[in-house]
Amino acid sequence: VTDDATRTLGKGSAPPGPVPEGLIRLYSMRFCPYAHRTRLVLQAKGIRHEVININLRNKPEWYFTKHPFGKIPVLENSKCQLIYESVIACEYLDDAYPGRKLYPCDSYERARQKMLLDLFYKILGYQNTVFFGGDCISMIDYLFWPWFERLDVYGIADCVNHTPALRLWIAAMKQDPTVCALLIDKNIFLGFLNLYFQNNPDAFDYGLGC
């Protein structure tokens, strides 16, 4: 597994070579919540992968051959097959790779998790379970988590004070080894946002060495 904290590739950069056999490549950006979803699933399932970070203010010309609109995340395997859209990419990883399954095997429970995307805060309180999928972390928890991790960065962590079930869920998620492995320091995140809102292309490499 390669380090996610690599410098971005931008306009004028050479395209990466073929994906090595036995690996899957993730085109990502360290601060993107949608790419964060995919990184969580890769980490949770222990999938061997490499990360190519893309400068979203200064996208490489070649990247539009990976995604027609230049968006992230994108997965690419050694057969040059491309998978994009974060929920689809996460589902692909769960289906294509062995080991821990993050989506339930039961068809109804699988469908129910997908329906929760629009009803999450109501369902969690109603179910009386720690996690959205039950008593153990599952795919739906990882799909939600990136936005909740960012609440403190945006200065709105108190927006969940009136929802005890959500507060318990956030506390439980912060104990998960996968979540802990991908946490970004708040000050680094704030530094990124400061440069990002100045339209500074160096924002995407904030906090990395030269």
Give the location of each predicted region.
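GST-like domain detector, emphasizing the conserved glutathione-binding G-site
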Residues: 1-128, 136, 200, 207-210
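C-terminal helix/juxtamembrane-tail motif
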Residues: 188-210
